[in-house]
Amino acid sequence: GRAAHAGIEPEKGRNAIEELALKIVKLRALNDFDRGSTVTIGTINGGENRIVVAESAEMDIDLRYRTKEDGEMLIRQVRDILEQAEIHGVRTEYTFTRNRPPLVQVEGSAQLQRLVEEASQELGIPYLTAVTGGVSDGNFVADIGTPTIDGLGPVGGMMCSPEEYLCLDSMTERIARMGTVVGWLGCLADVGRS
């Protein structure tokens, strides 16, 4: 943008905050919750004083997607929005950093899930499958072709909010299930070696 006094000659300024605000509206329109593709503006900062047209502003955007193809498409769409100036004379610089690849099903994932379901039944523990936009180190493991299931820890909810909670009662049963699955995997590995 370009700084200018907000009271004396605001027309000479180019407001970087307004530029981001206009881009945010377009970025928000990219959300496709059914598909699992989301764009979240996590932080925004700009300007130096209320009486000065903001010369600069910055924001952090979080992108989530379920497949690599959806991720590539979403990144292209975001890039197109960022590269288009909404206010004449304002320039946008951006950097993409990848945090985690999407958690994908690989060969062996279905068999691993069946083991978890069987252990849940044997122990009388409810087992529900769900697709979320959450991530873990498991995303990296799945990305290299290792069967991975995420979300087997204790029950909780309202993540990243003041109301976030954890059900302590669920920890024992979840540990038991994990122990059962790991034990079965060990037995399968022993059978495979003999």
Residue ranges and their predicted role:
Residues R2-S194:
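Metal-dependent amide/peptide-bond hydrolase catalytic core
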